[in-house]
Amino acid sequence: MTTTTHSTAAIMSLLDEAEWRQTQMDVGGLIQASALGKVALRYAVRKLMKRGARLRHDSGLYVCICDPSYEFLQMNLSKISWLERHCPPLDQELIMFGVIEAWEEASVRPTRQLVLFMTPKWDVFAYDSGILFFLAPSMAQFWHGAIVLEYWNALFPVEVRSHVRQHAHTMDDLVMVFHQLDYEKQVLEARRDKNTEGPRTFAKSVNSYVRAILESERRIREGKIPMTFVDRDSLRANSLAHIQATGAQPSHAPAQRVLSAPPSLPSPVSEEDPAAAATPPSSAATTPPSSVVPASVESELSSSPPLPPVVVKDVMYTAGEGDVVQMVVVV
């Protein structure tokens, strides 16, 4: 009985090693094809799709390599073309190379599906629930990076940008977010290795990036796809509905300052009022030159009662109506 158990374990180990080697070869072929261009990438994807290849990501997720002809794809070519035109700063073609799916027992179609795309400039995106998420600036970095679907790396369609402000306005902003997430991921992995091999270190302070990475790892360990918007505070703080509820000015409002009551100005001196002429001009002498106004305006100010101070709340700025995203967020 013991000999049979050891033999089975050895066979399983050999099969796992063979599967790992084949996965590495297939991933290397995809990386090489992506560097050669979109035609080579489409050919490599079609070849792996015929084999039914499912490649393991470093995070533990399995990527089903396929193109838009995949029978269980939950979007069509029209939707892909629409995303290419309505998710700035993306202005390139989206080349589909795989999906990450979640299935429930006896389900006819996937219960959840992440569709993976690559652009001719090697940027990798994931599509989920109407939003594109930037995952990596190249195919090689995608297979070793963190799968995080957060507000910072999201590209909202322009049709909903009057509900939520867009965080990244250029592709460089998205690449910067990727490097920040990758840095936090490497720090966490190095700390775990050090705790295993040597004396324990102090826990790292948990910021929004670390929280998103840890939640993504936890979901993957449970056999689930990482959820979107773990950091709800960032999303809520940039929701225009939340901003209007708190009394802030709309993002397109011009800059304003705190206004005070009008200054106390001397009454105009007329020739028919000699008593007023005899009054020493002490107030006029102490009035700064900036408060001297025309007589007509001065008479209106002196006859109207003083107004209370007007305090203007914080004002936010954007480049225009095209930079704001409207999306109804349920939290």
Swiss-Prot record:
The UniProt keyword set, sorted, is: Host cytoplasm, Host nucleus, Host-virus interaction, Modulation of host cell apoptosis by virus
Reply yes or no: does the keyword Transmembrane apply: no
- Biased composition of type Low complexity is found at 275-304
- Known Pfam families for this protein? US22
GO terms in the biological process aspect are: symbiont-mediated perturbation of host apoptosis
Gene Ontology CC terms: host cell cytoplasm; host cell nucleus; viral tegument
Per the entry, what this protein does is: Plays a role in the inhibition of host apoptosis to facilitate efficient viral replication. Promotes stabilization and inactivation of host TP53 through interaction with host MDM2. Induces host mTORC1 activation by antagonizing the ability of host TSC1/2 to negatively regulate mTORC1. Thus, inhibits a growth regulatory pathway to facilitate viral replication. Prevents premature cell host cell death by blocking host ubiquitin-specific protease 24/USP24-mediated autophagic ferritin degradation in lysosomes thus maintaining lysosome integrity and cellular viability.
Q: Which family does it belong to?
A: Belongs to the beta-herpesvirinae UL38 protein family.
Subunit: Interacts with host MDM2; this interaction leads to the stabilization of host TP53. Interacts with host TSC2; this interaction prevents host cell stress responses. Interacts with host USP24.
Q: What is this protein called?
A: Apoptosis inhibitor UL38
Name the encoding gene, please. UL38
